Curated annotation (Swiss-Prot):
GO terms for biological process: cellular response to hydrogen peroxide; hydrogen peroxide catabolic process. One of its GO terms (molecular function) is metal ion binding. Residues 1-29 are annotated as: Disordered. This is Catalase-peroxidase. InterPro entries: Catalase_peroxidase, Haem_peroxidase, Haem_peroxidase_sf, Peroxidases_AS, Peroxidases_heam-ligand_BS. The gene is katG. There is a cross-link at W101-Y227 (Tryptophyl-tyrosyl-methioninium (Trp-Tyr) (with M-253)).
Amino acid sequence: MTDSPDATTGGCPVAHGDRLPHPTQGGANTHWWPNRLNLKLLAKNPAVADPMGEEFDYAAEFKTLDLPAVKADIQEVLTTSQDWWPADFGHYGPLMIRMAWHSAGTYRVSDGRGGAGTGQQRFAPLNSWPDNVSLDKARRLLWPVKQKYGRKLSWADLMILAGNVALESMGFETFGFAGGRVDAWEPEDDVYWGAETTWLGSDQRISGGEQRELEKPLGATHMGLIYVNPEGPEGKPDPVAAARDIRETFGRMAMNDEETVALIAGGHTFGKTHGAAPDSNLGPDSEAAPLEAQGLGWHNSHGTGKGADTITSGLEVTWTSTPTQWSNGFFENLFGYEYELYQGPGGGWQWRPKDGAGEGTVPDAHDPSKKIAPNMLTTDLSLKVDPIYEPISRRFWENPQEFADAFARAWFKLTHRDMGPADRYLGPEVPSEELIWQDPIPKPDHELVGPAEIAELKGRIAESGLTVRQLVSTAWAAASTFRGSDKRGGANGGRIRLEPQRSWEVNEPDQLATVISTLEGIQESFNAGSGAKKVSFADLVVLAGGVGVEQAAQAAGFDVEVPFTPGRGDATAEQTDVESFSHLEPSSDGFRNYLGKGHPLPAEYQLVDKANLLTLSAPEMTVLVGGLRVLGANYQQSEQGVFTEKPGTLTNDFFVNLLQMGNTWKATDETSETFEATDASGQVKWTGTRFDLVFGSNSELRAVAEVYASDDAKEKFVRDFVAAWDKVMNLDRFDLA
């Protein structure tokens, strides 16, 4: 038997040196071919990994909760200090706020990934980020509550609810709480956290010298931090420079300057940071901790390793004189003193009032007889020295109620932004106010169309003069904005007719305007004469796409009916935040053979990323690409990948011709983004892109393509395409779930 792993490194107990890993330790294929396409991203959270079973309905279970009783149980946890991890100031509230914040604060608006929605803080890498030191203890403190309520309360909901209860228990009135977050059972490996291979590294993500350009889509300036280094950029204690980093990272979380100030000041009204000694005293993180640690990381060899000896960030800062009560104390101390830089007991840069001011005004976290001075982080002082943050901070200081309202709203946004529309919110504390960042969609105020009216509308669409390509590409443009990450986008709302979507390059604005005008004419005419039953523009776009698919299938010899369920609403321009929706604009869309400029990864990787956001499986991605190609849905009617002599006909020709032996593919230029296939005579037969050729090149995708290229697959291809198409059209129909 081998020796146990080195506790200082958290090393693997199986000594393999330079050997390939055992399958239980990871895949050898990634070692041999590190650039291989990772199609496991299209098989997230498989049913076989879910101990709750496929029939489990979390929403139904959550609705049976006695939420006040749950909150009372959490309150009991907050005020019952445990010897194994004593509470600062006798109250775990600040720890729970940090846990909830760090659960939600990984969200980034650019791709909707991160956030609190699936309880990812329980898994690597988040459970072991340097910024999450000791949050394993917060979750263990909550285990009795989770154990009591079991299936009725997810960890994802519990972590956010605990943050809310913590605020309320310390005298703050929150804006509301919504449940509905469903736990995942594995790490979300589809999130790109950065290229650095060392914790707190920033050398790969920061470029541009003093301009400090942060790599997209990242939301933090250092690997393993939620936002920024609290000591300042790369540990340099410069509040002015830190303000730039704060603005960039909070902006990438969809927070404006006022929300940013409110969040930082509100969060730092409570509790303290921990840096009793240098972090060299800490052992391996949670994921690397030895077996006997049972998932608790960062064993602290300094003193008792807890209480007054705790080490987390390595900074030792308490901001206010009432760290377990809501107050305006943060701003009072921020503006009430001039600060000087010094190194705290943990060796980190922090700030204290000059000339010994403030001594004896702040309580010690564990010794009631001891009083200390308030301290500040470099990033706290940014709120005082930055020309934009300073007047906001001063206004909040002078208007405490305005500050409280701003923090309540910003906290609710922070903890709910990744949940999608308010239709997904559960529980008695859901606020009634409509917020624009929720992408509100009015519910239809009319009777929905039935089978007879649907048939009539389909006839009008078919006679409108719009082509299969126009019908299909418009419906795809509307529906494919959906992101499974934060549940934004989709056809519901009919925002394809509004800015910014109607002007996106990928949507070919001139052609789109024609389709919109034609469909609006059909809608107006129908609604004027249909009595009580009416159709929304959003419904009409999806119905029209289905008409296009049906026409193409019929041309191929198959009589199919594309499913259609009315009930979508039409949003207004006033309900649409143009800046926020700009983040949904595709910079590439392999389904339409559209590739923008400036991408760090080859096209096929972007296709998989897009399919992941659309929650597609590898077969669904494959059949949709093959179908959309022969339907002519390419950007600007490009011939790339249209491997058929019968465009507009829903055949399996894409796969048949791609896999046809005897053709020779060659890149058309040094970029290797477009290719030509020549036959034995040397004549160019087809042209294609990386989006296309990957289905013949990648061994896994080729295996799927072979299914659809087979002689007996013509009908299967059509049926599978319709099923995948219908899935995409309804991804945002949370009312149907």
